[in-house]
Each structure stands twice: as structure tokens, then as C-alpha cells.
């Protein structure tokens, strides 16, 4: 699944400051072009009830662990072999106003250990009685006696259908369970659900799926665990005018449905052996564009007919073939299927989902329009496609054994998405962006005492809610970061060879992370060049089995190098033990005054010494070249001063990525009280002559924390003046490069730098920027059919107009939002609507999030996050969340990956005793309701608030003085 959109999957690929000066208030709205990894698993809840009163009952039990149906993991007694599933979705409501689907399922399974209980997952399905029971059971091959059912029951808490038998099943024999059922085709974005959209003023309804991680059971009864692989024969009964899609191609043309000639039946080819969470089927009237890869694989891009007719699927079609071919070569394994369908859905909770052969996307992650999509939108499309196609091998062909190793699936895809996208767009330098989008992004979370290791014991991940929590930035971005580090010190060639060996060995099977280490070790052992200080397993286990990461400290006077577990709050208490005592085996690259040095390994000890890190009076050293290692670097004060001098005299001597590193690391070290905050601020002085994107983005991301802490205090005035001074040369640079904004930069990085220049200049009151934005918006408002604003600058211009305007400007943008046909444009407009500095307008906007006809369910949490990023809106959203917590939790709390992002967003300004007390009271008040997938985020918010409170008390005066002196 794609990184959340992360909206998260903020989280993001491109963070753009959208804040703009208003008459009394400067509002900066962060808009994140990101691959949000929203999730859609749900946990069930049930009260205890009495024992069953009849042969077939629906019962919710207490968790008496001696009963196998009260254990969340399936017993190993039965293993599925195949499913024959027929489903019929009704896309008009019944006489009760409900949308439903009906279905039948025949699951064949093998008995591995004799048992008199059949346990299979089932969620919110109503069964048609078979001789008084919910299912029928028979032996395969006609052996006797046939199984006799005593009773069947549904266990709501563990989401099981339980079949109690008179006699045990026989080990080694196959059985078939037959069921007929009905479920609701709800609009909850989970399992088999419905999506709605408007086409030419007419409401259209489609049926689609999202199974990961525990929602296949909501569509039909199944053994819903990733290691319970089987083959699937899917048949869909659907209206004549609609098309049905699934993981495989149809066996042949659709045939009339005998009971009703207005319906037809589409039967699909048998799937390879696969996991339930990768199943997909869709019924819609969508159109497509198609091509064939050189290998012969059929490639189709599906979307609303109007989107296809306008060419919005063409870019995805263009890059899919090259990316598939790249991964076939990269993995040394052919694409396993004969077709690759990708479909853009109007309602989709995740950024995308890697269903085998039928990948589902948010529209913003698949559709691109040259006229109205920004460079960030285009980058998102190619990287999300690469992420999902990477999964077709790593995740689908070879699958994790259990969700505790989710990082192996998602971390790998989050790393190689940059490789696949770079192959499709080789001039964009996309691989460099991983440092900003993943490494630095996840360090902010991994530096908390409440973080968690990449891999945890399987016994700690059981319930659907626990599984949902694993879908976080640690699994995605830290997983990607440490795999990138591993690939770097092994070399990419050895890494690829190990991956290919791993895939060849375990194809159609399941693995744990140790299997990957074994195959990488095998390729290391077969060559003489790369020498490691220990085995791959010994090195990497320290990075995945203990949380956090080290800060490497260098004393250039003595050449001493040391490591320490880095914590943003040095007073926080780490309660999670580590078998490695929070020491890592660290690969260290370095340069001396611009010249590369030999590679060095810091073994799993606290301190070592090497002359590589010892300097003379005129030398400086810089560690972690291009940030290939997952760690921070600190230096003695003298070396820091030399680096600062180098940056202010000739910054080109230090690579671009490391110019970003110097800024990022220093601000984090200052937060942890390892360097003075003035040192970190001094590292931004060179920006007055910097035009590259990455250093500026690192600075803006770091200084955004200062803004959050101080935009309600007297510090903000001098801070605004300083940033205005620093960004003005960058704004003037792009004014010249673009010939007074009549042209646009050629390279992607320069385009991103231009976006930062304009958004930051407008945010901090550069008059020329404000005039530019106002002029462009006025031209558009005068002629709405002809938008003169370049897509790259629209978010900034829209936000500026809303912040400086009133109800008229807000209503105009709202009208354009309602009319927007391309979701990328709608997202820009929706984000800008949060920029208002008028409380009543923001409260009205908040109320719209409760109406799915105004704000789609998939967009609610991101809309709330956008409003909370506005200094005026933050308190409003916090009050809104507290007042509406039960409804928000009911709608999004049990599965949505973005739900945890909402908690993070609404609390990120918290830095006072009162706000800490409010947060603690909020936790206390809602213990009965619960926090679902935001449980860990709430604990992290409490930890961050305490750290913020302490940091502001200690640094406010010195920061005020520094900005005053340097502005």
C-alpha cells in the first residue's frame, strides 16, 4: 500500500509552505504533496453474552483463551486450498434504503491436524440457513462418514464463523465448506464497498474493494491471514451496462444471467496461490486506455469515462510499462501475471493498494493533467505507481508470514519506488528526495521514547486494531531508510542479487525477515570485494529489532567517534529494553575538506578512535556522505564553525544533500540539547546565497517547528523578518530565471525550489510576492474558465487570496472546488480553503466535514489537518475533535491510517501547561470510546507536548534575541 497521504501519505514527498500574510495574522498552511499511506482495517467490538441457546446462533464471547475461537490468530489445523466465490452487488438501494451484495462461496481446505472445530473469518455477513446451520460441510472424494455439524456461531469480537462438529475431521483429507450470504455494500471504504461520483450531473455508483489488512472477511468467509494462501475463482454477476474487473482476466466473454436478462455473469481465470488481502473486484462503467509492455503484458488504466476521454490516464499508461520492465530486470524475475490493471477510484481510503493484477488508487495518485496538475502531482503519480508495482513481486509473489514484519513489504516498496520512478523519469533526480521524504520524516518519530522497532514478535500483533497500528511511518519510511543503507554498504549489485535469490526461492510462499538476511549473506559470501565487520544479520538486526537510531559524535581534535541513542527529549525515559543496549553497527562515510575518505565501520561499541576523523587547523570533516546512513552527526564546536565558514564562502564544496544534512542534523541536535540552538540557526545563514531545493526544504521543515512553537508569541515578528530577508534573494533569482514569471524552470528540483521561493516569500510578507499572487488570483476570478496560474503556484496563490480576502474570495474558491473535475485541482482548492483567518468561516468549513456530500469521507482527516495547520484554525479543530470524537472514531478510528495523522496535526502546536492538561483530560474522557489506530499517536502527542513545553521555556529568550539580531 502506498505511503500515506500518508495526506498524510503526508508525509510527504513535497512539503510546501503555503502560509500567507494577512492584515493582522500571518497564516502558513503546509500542503504536502505526499503518498499517503492511509489504512482501512477495522476491529470489531462486542459485549459478553450468554452461551448459545440454539444450534445456530450469533454470539459474542469473552476472551477465554482456552477456546480457540477467542484467540485472534487462526489455528494451524486447517489450510485453505481454493475458493470459488460468486458475488452480486446491487448498485441501487433496497426497500430499506441499503445497498447490499449477495454471494456464495465454496472453500476447499486440507485438515493438517485432526479437529472437531472449523474456524474461519467472517465479518458483518448474514448467512442463509443450510439445514439449520450457516454453512454446509462435506468431504472431498466421497469418503465416509461425512462431517456432521452440531452448531454454527458467529463470534463478533474475533470476527469468526465457528462450525462445531460431531466428530473430528481427519488429518490429511480435504473438505469443502459451502455458504450463501448477504452483506452491506456500505460507503465505509473497507472490504466490498460502494463509491459514488457525479458524471454530467448524474450520480453514479460503483462497487469496489479494499481488503488490506483484515477486510476480505467482510466480503466472504475466508481464512483471512497472509500466510493462508490459496487460489481463487472469482465470478461477478453485474448489470449488463457495467464492466467487472478482478485480479485476473475473464475466462471469456460475459454471459447472460439466467434469472434476469438485464444482468450478466463474468467469470475470471483462476488466480495464482495468493493471500486474501490482495484480492480485488470492481463493478463500474469506467473506461480505459491500454497498451502492451514489450514482454506482452496487457496494461490498462481505468477511470471515470470523462477522465479517460480528457487524457488523464495517459501519463500513468506511459510510465507503467517501463516500470514493470525495470522491476522484472531488477528482480531478475518476470512479472508473474498476464495483465496489469490500474484503476483510479473516487473514494479510496489509502493512497493506493497493490492488489495483484488490479491495483487500486486514489484519483490523485493515478490521474495527471498537464494543464492543471503540478510537478508534485506528477511526481506523486510516478512514485506511487512504482511503489505498487514493486509490490507485485515483493509482497504479492513473496509475502510476509505475519503483519509484525509489515516493514519488509512496505519498507522495501518505499525504497525501490524511487528506483523504479527514477528509471521512468531519469532526469528528475528522484532518488535524492528520499532523504527528505523518508529518512528525515521518520526520524522525527523514531527519536521519541514512544517509538517502536521495525520488527516486533508476532505474538504482540494480534487484533485488527494492532495490525492497523503497524501501518505507520516506521514500517514505511524507516524500513525504506535502513534498506537503502543496506543496499549502499553492500552495493546495489549485490543487493539486487540477494533479492533475486530470495524471490526465486520463496515465490508463492511466505517469509520472515531472517530469510532475506540469509540470501543477502549468501551473495556476500560468494564474492571477495565487499568485506563486512559481521554478518548481514548481526549488522541489520540492531537496526530492526531495537527502536530509534544513533547520533554519531566526532571529536576532530582526537579523532574519537562515539554513538548514543538519539532522543529528541533527553529527559524522556526509554522503557522498552534492547538486547543490543541501543548500540548499532554503523557504516560511516566521510569527506575531508571536500575530498572523500575511506569507508569506516563503527562496531557495536560506544566509542572508538581513528585518524580519519582527526583534523588539522585548516581541515574539516563531514560524515554520512549523501545521508546514506540512518543516523545524525554531531561535531566539536570548532569543526562546526569550519563547516559554517565553508558554506558561507563556497557552498559548492559540500554536496547538496549534505548542505541539507548540516541544517537538519543541527536543528535536531539543538532540540535534544546537544548543541546550542544558536548553532543550528547559524547554519541557516548561508541560505541567502542558496538556490537548491534540498537545503532550503530542510531549513523550512526545521524552522516550521519554530513557527509552530512561536507563531502565537512575540518571537514570530523577528522570525518573520529574518526569513523574509533570507528568502528575498531566492525569490528574485526565480523572478529572473522565469523572466518575470512568464516561464518556468526546466528541472524538477528547480521547479520545487521555485515553489518554495514563492510560497515562503508570500508567507513572510515579501511585497512583490503578495502583489504577484493577488494579480494572478484577480485575473482568474475575473475569468474562471481560463486559469492563468501555473499549477505549481496554485496552492500558494489560492491560499494567499483566501488569507487576505474574506467571504467573497472563500466562496469563489469553494465554488471552484465543487466544480473541479480533476482531484489534484480539487485538493489544492480544498487545502487553500483552510487558509482563512476568519473564525466563523473556518467553523463553517469544519461543519462541512460532517457532510459526505460536501467533503468526501476519504478527505475528512486531511481537511481537519489542513485547518489545524492554520494558527487561527488549530484551536477550532481541537475543540471540534473533542466534541465529535465518538463520531470521528466510529467513522475512521479503527482502520484509517490518516486517523493517527489527525492527532499529530491537531496537537503539534501544543506547548503550554494548559494544552498538556487538555490533552491528558481528552485521553481520560475518551478511554471508553478508545483511540483505535491513533492510540500510539496519542501517546506520542503527549510525549511531544511535554518536550515542546520544556523546549520553549529553555529557548524562547535566546531564539528571540538571535532572530532580532539577524533580521
UniProtKB/Swiss-Prot annotation:
Substrate binds at residues 351-355. PROSITE patterns: ZINC_PROTEASE. Glycans are attached at residues 38, 84, 126, 233, 338, 626, 682, 740. The modification Sulfotyrosine is found at residues 175, 418. It is found in: Cell membrane. Zn(2+) binds at residues 387, 391, 410. Residues 33-66 are annotated as: Cytosolic Ser/Thr-rich junction. One of its GO terms (molecular function) is zinc ion binding. Broad specificity aminopeptidase which plays a role in the final digestion of peptides generated from hydrolysis of proteins by gastric and pancreatic proteases. Also involved in the processing of various peptides including peptide hormones, such as angiotensin III and IV, neuropeptides, and chemokines. May also be involved the cleavage of peptides bound to major histocompatibility complex class II molecules of antigen presenting cells. May have a role in angiogenesis and promote cholesterol crystallization. This is Aminopeptidase N. The lineage of its organism: Eukaryota, Metazoa, Chordata, Craniata, Vertebrata.
